[in-house]
UniProtKB/Swiss-Prot annotation:
Sites of the 5-imidazolinone (Ala-Gly) crosslink: 143-145
GO CC terms: cytoplasm
One GO BP: L-histidine catabolic process to glutamate and formamide
Family statement: Belongs to the PAL/histidase family.
Alphabetized InterPro entries for the sequence: Aromatic_Lyase (IPR001106), Fumarase/histidase_N (IPR024083), HutH (IPR005921), L-Aspartase-like (IPR008948), Phe/His_NH3-lyase_AS (IPR022313)
Pathway participation: Amino-acid degradation; L-histidine degradation into L-glutamate; N-formimidoyl-L-glutamate from L-histidine: step 1/3
EC category name: lyase
CDD domains: PAL-HAL (cd00332)
UniProt name for this protein: Histidine ammonia-lyase
Post-translational modifications: Contains an active site 4-methylidene-imidazol-5-one (MIO), which is formed autocatalytically by cyclization and dehydration of residues Ala-Ser-Gly.
Length: 513
């Protein structure tokens, strides 16, 4: 199998995590082997000295005061994996689990967790062979790490549970055998190292970030199309306005809207003599709303990139001094905050998009035929797609309630404050999907609105977007079964095709226009 990304522990870029999520093949940088071996040898030395170290020769959680005999250390590590593999719910999507595996791999490879080189090699081999453990999506409170989801990963490594090989769902032992791999017998600390950490929450949050970024870029295109359909003004996007405020996301999104609308004949047709003084906020304030969403997404991205390159195990092994120190890096509060920010961003992206669709279907606001149909009354046109958009936006509003402000004590009050990062991060994919449908509906409505202005044409960029949609969805003349049209439009949003077809650099979490 060819490798397109080499993971360098502690130095993996956001672009590399995105590529991995999108299906790129990966392998671990061999340069980490020495640090991993030193870390494992440090744990062996601690065991030989007989000094008590949490999770190495003690029980777990509230049972940390129980000493474990040396001959039982392998059983201890197997037991923690089996007992903690207690997740429920639907399997986590394979791309997210692959992200989780890679995050765990690069964390362990930094040589602070005490795992054996062969354990790391097995995880690397599973990732490269396309063996993806079945990981139930529910059961983590985000401290002490993502115990249940990561335990299902660890269980597959010891031949327990299930795993996907391609589309096949197999017993984990059979999945390993499929690639001529042997289950591991875990040594001191290895089970705890595999299941302690924030990798599940971080993987879900990164997946959400990447999907929401795609949604935001598509929404800039549909927002510009809506301005054209309503014969709105591009004056609110003037660079001088946004420079005076200085918000970077606002400046970037305004620049994108200007570029998207450049050379539009529709815009020029009403530049002079338009009696309207100002457009509705949903058109005029796009840079302020979308820019704020972009800034929040960039802040979340920075947090997640740091987390993805960090070590969130406990205890941590310091080979230079021969110590294993107990701390709290497993507490996923940074991830929870980032997930909450992303939830707010995608909620607002969808919210202002729905308002534009509502504006377009209202002839009093848009100047277009009612519900964008040539014969309103006989036909209902876009009446109910706008209702669907409203329903999805309201669903996202409910989901946007911050998860990080919730906490519930666990493990007999030993683990008495938790982050709820997994809950906050898991919702993001569903929220992004809802928003993609909302923006897909706006795409249909805005292009339909532009069709009423024929023979006038929009800008080069927006005409490319119109052509992309019209290749799959014809202009609505009379009512037809709407569902396939909506699915086709949302697919253009989610795939990134809509943002790519305009051939203009659109702002994302890593770059400006």
């Amino acid at each position: 199998m060819s490798v397109s990304i080499v993971l360098q522990p502690g130095q993996v870029t956001l672009a590399q995590w995105r590529a991995l999520y999108r299906g790129a093949e990966v392998a671990l940088d061999d340069a980490c082997a020495a640090a991993v071996l030193r870390s494992a040898q440090t744990v062996e030395a601690i065991v030989a000295r007989g000094e008590p170290v949490y999770g190495v020769n003690t029980g777990f959680g509230k049972l940390a005061s129980v000493r474990i005999e040396r001959e039982d250390l392998q059983a201890l590590q197997r037991n923690i994996v089996l007992s903690h593999a207690a997740g429920v719910g639907e399997p986590t999507p394979v791309p997210v689990v692959r992200l989780m595996m890679a995050l765990k791999l690069t964390s362990l490879a930094q040589g602070a967790s005490g795992v054996q080189p062969d354990t790391l090699a097995l995880l690397d081999a599973m990732l490269r062979a396309g063996i993806t453990p079945v990981v139930p999506c529910q059961g983590s409170v985000g401290a002490s790490g993502d115990l249940a989801p990561l335990s299902h990963l660890a269980a597959a490594m010891i031949g327990v549970g299930e795993a996907f090989v391609g589309a096949q769902r197999l017993p984990a032992a059979d999945a390993l055998a499929h690639a001529q791999l042997q289950p591991r017998v875990l040594g001191a600390k290895e089970g705890l190292a595999l299941l302690n950490g924030t990798q599940f929450s971080t993987a879900c949050a990164l997946a959400g970030l990447f999907e929401i970024e795609t949604v935001l870029q598509a929404a800039l295109v549909t927002g510009a199309l809506s301005v054209e359909a309503a014969k709105g003004s591009d004056t609110p996007f003037d660079a001088r306005i946004h420079a005076l405020r200085g918000q970077p996301g606002q400046i970037a999104t305004a620049a994108a809207l200007r570029a998207l609308m450049a050379d539009s004949a529709i815009r020029e047709s009403h530049r002079l003599g338009d009696v309207r003084v100002q457009d509705p906020y949903c058109l005029r304030c796009q840079p302020q709303v979308m820019g704020a969403a972009l800034d929040v997404m960039r802040q979340a991205a920075r947090t997640l990139e740091i987390e993805a390159n960090g070590v969130s195990d406990n205890p941590l092994v310091f080979s230079d001094t021969g110590e294993a120190l107990s701390g709290g890096n497993f507490h996923a509060e940074p991830v929870a905050f980032a997930a909450d920010m992303l939830a707010m961003a995608v909620c607002e992206i969808g919210s202002i998009s729905e308002r534009r669709t509502a504006m377009l279907v209202d002839p009093a606001l848009s100047g277009l035929p009612a519900f964008l149909t040539p014969r309103p009354g006989l036909n209902s046109g876009f009446m109910i797609p706008q209702v669907t958009a409203a329903a999805l936006v309201s669903e996202n509003k409910q989901r946007a309630y911050p998860a990080s402000v919730d906490s519930i004590p666990t493990s007999a009050n030993q683990e008495d404050h938790v982050s709820m990062a997994a809950h906050g991060a898991r919702r993001l994919l569903a929220m992004a999907e809802n928003a993609a449908h909302v923006i897909g509906i706006e795409l249909l409505a805005a292009v339909q609105g532009c069709d009423f202005h024929a023979p006038l044409r929009s800008s080069t960029a927006l005409e490319a977007a119109r052509a992309l949609l019209r290749a799959q969805v014809p202009t609505l003349q009379d009512d037809r079964y709407f569902h396939p049209d909506m699915l086709a439009a949302s697919a253009l949003v989610r795939s990134g095709a809509l943002a790519q077809t305009v051939a203009i650099p659109l702002p994302g979490v890593e770059q400006d226009v």
